[in-house]
Amino acid sequence: MSLQKLENSSNKSVVQEEVLILTELLEDITKNMLAPETFEKIIQLKELSTQEDYQGLNRLVTSLSNDEMVYISRYFSILPLLINISEDVDLAYEINHQNNIDQDYLGKLSTTIKLVAEKENAVEILEHLNVVPVLTAHPTQVQRKSMLDLTNHIHSLLRKYRDVKLGLINKDKWYNDLRRYIEIIMQTDMIREKKLKVTNEITNAMEYYNSSFLKAVPHLTTEYKRLAQAHGLNLKQAKPITMGMWIGGDRDGNPFVTAKTLKQSALTQCEVIMNYYDKKIYQLYREFSLSTSIVNVSKQVREMARQSKDNSIYREKELYRRALFDIQSKIQATKTYLIEDEEVGTRYETANDFYKDLIAIRDSLLENKGESLISGDFVELLQAVEIFGFYLASIDMRQDSSVYEACVAELLKSAGIHSRYSELSEEEKCDLLLKELEEDPRILSATHAEKSELLAKELAIFKTARVLKDKLGDDVIRQTIISHATSLSDMLELAILLKEVGLVDTERARVQIVPLFETIEDLDHSEETMRKYLSLSLAKKWIDSRNNYQEIMLGYSDSNKDGGYLSSCWTLYKAQQQLTAIGDEFGVKVTFFHGRGGTVGRGGGPTYEAITSQPLKSIKDRIRLTEQGEVIGNKYGNKDAAYYNLEMLVSAAINRMITQKKSDTNTPNRYEAIMDQVVDRSYDIYRDLVFGNEHFYDYFFESSPIKAISSFNIGSRPAARKTITEIGGLRAIPWVFSWSQSRVMFPGWYGVGSSFKEFINKNPENIAILRDMYQNWPFFQSLLSNVDMVLSKSNMNIAFEYAKLCEDEQVKAIYETILNEWQVTKNVILAIEGHDELLADNPYLKASLDYRMPYFNILNYIQLELIKRQRRGELSSDQERLIHITINGIATGLRNSG
């Protein structure tokens, strides 16, 4: 049975009603704030945009004064935000509704568990599956926390709208509350005055744990085990979802991430989870008023009660309460020790000790007629302890390979081993490094030579990691990632630094060494690099000590910027095939960490389809993927959305593991040969323009708001690793962000159309082959669907206005090249899909874009005019911030940024 997406079953009329109410309130509030003639211009702008009268729209925007721009920009930035909230509420309602009526939908957990239960190895699959969303703080989260808090209030009110319609809630009060929060939003700064610090990013991430993850993850795990049990599958230690974190440990290109921020990130996480445990234990304490006059308790609970300092005469017979008081006291003492290094009483040594005490309570209840008390909060607390321990989320450390090389070169020189390490050949480097790792037990940094700031900083981070692992548990830091990994020596250099602080030795590795292959070239050579690594007896011991898993991270953003969307997707697909095969050859479980962004140009797109279209056998039982700054709020802003999106991750991974489609086994040889041919041409088309056209650099920087984005206070990390003098030096995130703002969406489609058109023109029958690929190959279907979505969000009329910002005619002429490829791509996509219009298979998104597009199209024209005035020197520094407001509004309307 073919299941539809949950979004496409939603009640669009309710969303439209809510949007109408929100729009009327926003208009009324804005009307009271503005002069009548200014407010009238807002109405005129909406009419012109709805009619697609872009010339009239441009004329009216040009006539606006700088002061008028302030409120008009705010109005059109807030409107798409309110629409987003309404859609999110509708999705949350639909999730609950479909579950309550037991209706299947694509990715539903119960449907997936039922499917896997039929397999002989069902218990093995479900027991070992582990999907890890890794939260990052890439500089694309444009919303301030204050704005997020306000939108959460509106979200809560809109959830009550159906009750208002039924007369179950006072309509006037509901309406006035809604108005009040919209009015506060209208008068609140939408963007940050100052750039975020890493500490701010850590705090912001923790808000999502408090609002959603701490509710959704244990609940999903409980449901996962319950559904399996219903099919006779007894799962013991299953953890389908655990959490990862980059904030505080990802120092690639971010000089503000240090040993101090790593420690702060870990201890902040610890504080959040310990507070959660404290609160949950207290709730149980309040509930469990069971008396031994009525029911008995186990011997172990009696002993816990005896040790308790809760000596109230009123609780002499309430042994569960006394035992829980003892548990809570230990949790509080443990928190004080872990965070403040202070011993204040009996504490837990490990999270497992805490878990054992809770199990003692559970077993006593089971033995003494208290089965019903174990459901709900109690069982979810047990799941939380298993999942989160005392550390909450595993923090990754990441640094660029060039930094590791510089540090190792300095160590070798100061220790008198080699003075010119960086000048050695790859083979010579590896021989030298292996000798140090295998034969020399000494610590190179023990020398009295003064260390450079770079080396001292890196060693301090690794030393802090070791201390945190000893204190909070080994899982607090599991991986250390090498950005721009190109060779075996890159991996061994990191091992040298880890050896310095005792995180690796000749027998084991306390953290996994994870290469990140990012560019097209590095992905092409990744098989060779990993073959050399897996051939090492030393590496085999390290991998064995990590339960025979070897993780490899794949970079979607840089490979896209390097070779275009089609080339990136296909190179990543083939790399996974090759790396999976080499893992099987060496008897190692190769798992993948997908470095996806929020946009298609950075590997984004619908999560379920992305996972289920991965190569055959590439998902063993673990998969990790980044959840980037700008989409965390959309996907995990509340517990319902979080549950749904986590459910999609788990179901997709299971379905890909168990589904052996005919297309997987019979089609690759023919289809892959076609893809190789088409991709080679697409790569050349993309590279010829981006890196081969001497005017392209100027076109990009003059026809986009990249300069404003670079100064936008949306993250702690700089927009580039170094001074930008070429496209290659620009980070992938502002690269994609800028193209989104100018509505070209270039990274998500350029080079796709012409390469397929040339293939079709070679033989009239080739279009039928491509249609067959689209119908029967999940990878190809996902690829084209993403291009379809990106094209639907682009607007080449608006893109032309941005092109006019270029002064040189030769530079400006690049627009025609881009436009021609856009039209070719659209025609080819529709021809292969067999559709007459874009988004034919996604009516929910189409409807959403149809009623939001007119509003944020206006923001593009306002942004264009502001950029022109800025370049003419007509804006004050305060007025220049208006450009940032438009950036915020457009990103909100598109529902992604970088």
Curated annotation (Swiss-Prot):
SUPFAM superfamilies: Phosphoenolpyruvate/pyruvate domain. This is Phosphoenolpyruvate carboxylase. GO terms for molecular function: magnesium ion binding; phosphoenolpyruvate carboxylase activity. GO terms for biological process: carbon fixation; oxaloacetate metabolic process; tricarboxylic acid cycle. The active site is at H138, K561. NCBIfam families: PRK00009.1. Belongs to the PEPCase type 1 family. Forms oxaloacetate, a four-carbon dicarboxylic acid source for the tricarboxylic acid cycle. PANTHER family: PHOSPHOENOLPYRUVATE CARBOXYLASE (PTHR30523:SF6). Its EC number is 4.1.1.31. It catalyses: oxaloacetate + phosphate = phosphoenolpyruvate + hydrogencarbonate. It comes from Streptococcus pneumoniae serotype 2 (strain D39 / NCTC 7466). Its cofactor is Mg(2+). Keywords: Carbon dioxide fixation, Lyase, Magnesium. It comes from the Bacteria. GO terms for cellular component: cytosol.
